[in-house]
Amino acid sequence: MLNMLKDFKIIFRTIMEEITDTQEFTKDMTFEEFKEDRKTQKAVIRGLEIIGEAMNQIPKDFQKKYYKVDWSKWIKFRNMLIHVYHAVDLELVWNAIQEELPTLYSRMLWLVENPFIPKPSDYKK
């Protein structure tokens, strides 16, 4: 994947799109409503999985350099959602949506708008 990727900003934009969708899906919802809405849960969880998987495509050296994004937290969160699918803690998911995604969005936006972000060809995975 990394060899085919010409620009990390494609990944960052994908993450931003998933955040926007997740926020739109849960807009005006309470946690109680979210707990009862399996369709929204599934859509949101899938979006969070995509965010973690996209972040996992970013080389570790890049992650270390741009440490204000908690790459490993989101990758671990994705792994938990994928592998503990039978017992996902919806409160944890809800808190991520409400408290973590806005900050992540602003950090992804900064990376997208930064003209000095290196290209994938500058890194080995």
Identify the function of each model-found stretch.
Residues 1-125:
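Solvent-exposed interaction patches of small proteins and small membrane subunits
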